[in-house]
Amino acid sequence: MATKPTEPVTILSLRKLSLGTAEPQVKEPKTFTVEDAVETIGFGRFHIALFLIMGSTGVVEAMEIMLIAVVSPVIRCEWQLENWQVALVTTMVFFGYMVFSILFGLLADRYGRWKILLISFLWGAYFSLLTSFAPSYIWFVFLRTMVGCGVSGHSQGLIIKTEFLPTKYRGYMLPLSQVFWLAGSLLIIGLASVIIPTIGWRWLIRVASIPGIILIVAFKFIPESARFNVSTGNTRAALATLERVAKMNRSVMPEGKLVEPVLEKRGRFADLLDAKYLRTTLQIWVIWLGISFAYYGVILASAELLERDLVCGSKSDSAVVVTGGDSGESQSPCYCHMFAPSDYRTMIISTIGEIALNPLNILGINFLGRRLSLSITMGCTALFFLLLNICTSSAGLIGFLFMLRALVAANFNTVYIYTAEVYPTTMRALGMGTSGSLCRIGAMVAPFISQVLMSASILGALCLFSSVCVVCAISAFTLPIETKGRALQQIK
């Protein structure tokens, strides 16, 4: 039987064999995430429009919150209110804010940031206008509480900004949003100095509602967050939004197909207390509570010091005491001391302080990091609260208030950025909402310290503010996660 001749095995024949049997590699299609798209598209005209429109939510929020500080002397006299009654107005505003911060955060993670932002502005504008017709103190408190409920949803504007901004621009653009809060604060103080002495506080509230109404119309130019759409599985809407951003920025989209992460349940409160985020969440809550306590404490203390002339602990002799009733049993003093033009000037100067440290704040959070920057500014805030107790001239008081406003504003800037960056998209709005809610507990307590305790003991009130700031500084320094230069997380 004849056999087929075999070819000798050589290196060349083995190489041919290996080349002949190699299976062709299947080329996988290119894909990209929302994060890739945001970074590729870069910063441009869309982000400028986003910054102006979403930043203006800070103007409206500042006007609604600061309004209480400038109308307090007027309603104190009109309805003959005691200290605790004046403080209760601010407390109830923040009570409404606290309750609805959680609700709006849950709804925003489920149904979208844009929808909740629009609803909150419609709500706030409606009840703000109704406040101007309040027939009594009780109605005034109730309606301002409803305004607080609406204002609590304004933080969704910050989330939308954060989710559209490229990583390297977040640390610069988000602190600049403080300009809008400053503008709102200055605007309401300026309007109050003109409107209250002429046509009254009710017209001040009506005029203050106008910016919010205008902004509602402007919202149609801003789309829903692409990150939110992708996280809910709506990649088509997310892709359309990203293409619109790229076109407006005259940029290009990354090559490939937009992919979505594994879908998770959204807006679960339990996620905030998951082992991965438990310590971060608890420390953030402490910091938010303390920062809000200090911030609104400074604002209300400034108004109280000016209204009652409590510099160096002496009450003004010029306060008019109004007693309710005809009998001697009714001893309910109401200090009718309206703000003079000089008082409005002092408030304006101290308010401008909110932007004084902005350049240093931007450098700090981008070079030192969010944690260290926040711990330094909180420590300085504690120091200046104590310095405020020093007997000094009017110029000295203005200087201390100026620095305090600068520091507390820097604190808010940093904690807003950190909170928006540390949580993933699936729970970011809820994280902001719950933090904002805890924050309002501090704001609810602040009026009773600034407007009630301060009347009895300035040193006691200032030491309390300072101690809380020290606790927050330690908490900020020991936060477990640093978000400087870190990409936004899409899923948990």
Swiss-Prot record:
It comes from Homo sapiens (Human). It holds the Pfam family Sugar_tr. The chain crosses the membrane at residues 48-68, 86-106, 121-141, 179-199, 203-223, 281-301, 348-368, 383-403, 429-449, 458-478. GO terms for cellular component: membrane. This is Putative transporter SVOPL. Keywords: Membrane, Transmembrane, Transmembrane helix, Transport. The keyword Cytoplasm does not apply. InterPro entries: MFS, MFS_dom, MFS_sugar_transport-like, MFS_trans_sf. It is found in: Membrane. Belongs to the major facilitator superfamily. It comes from the Eukaryota. The keyword Secreted does not apply. GO terms for molecular function: transmembrane transporter activity. It is a multi-pass membrane protein.
